[in-house]
C-alpha cells in the first residue's frame, strides 16, 4: 500500500500489524463500501470508515473526534483465491481531521485559496 500502510506478507501480519492497530486507534467503526468493481481476475472497491479516534494513531493521542477514513482496495484473484491485495488509505486526510497538517500549509489547497501562486512551467 501507500506510505504509512506498510507491507504485509501473511494473514497473521495483516491481523497483527494492520487490523489490530486500526481497531485499537479507532472505535465505533462503521464500514462503508461506496463502489465495488470487477474486471477479469481483478476486483476493487473504494469507500470509507466512519470512526471515533479513541486510541493512539501514528503518535497522536486520542482526540475522541469522529473521522472519515477513505480507502481503496484491489485484489488479484486466481482459482478463487486472493493472490495479491493492494490497499491505499488517505492518511493525510485522517491526520488533517486530527488537526495535523502533513503538508505544513503547502498543500495544493493553498493554490485554491489564493495564498500562493503556482510556479510557471519550464
Predicted regions and their residues:
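C-terminal and inter-domain tail/linker signature
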Residues: 1-122
Amino acid at each position: 500500500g501507500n506510505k504509512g500502510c506498510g507491507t504485509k506478507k501473511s494473514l497473521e501480519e495483516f491481523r497483527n500489524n494492520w487490523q489490530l492497530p486500526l481497531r485499537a486507534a479507532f472505535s465505533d467503526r462503521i464500514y462503508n463500501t461506496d463502489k465495488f468493481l470487477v474486471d477479469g481476475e481483478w476486483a476493487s472497491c473504494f469507500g470509507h470508515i466512519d470512526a471515533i479516534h479513541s486510541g493512539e494513531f501514528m503518535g497522536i493521542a486520542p482526540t475522541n473526534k469522529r473521522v472519515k477514513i477513505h480507502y481503496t482496495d484491489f485484489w488479484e484473484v486466481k482459482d478463487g483465491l486472493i493472490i495479491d491485495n493492494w490497499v491505499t488509505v488517505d492518511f493525510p486526510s485522517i491526520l488533517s481531521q486530527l488537526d495535523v497538517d502533513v503538508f505544513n500549509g503547502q498543500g495544493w489547497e493553498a493554490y485554491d485559496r489564493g495564498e500562493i501562486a503556482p510556479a510557471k512551467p519550464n
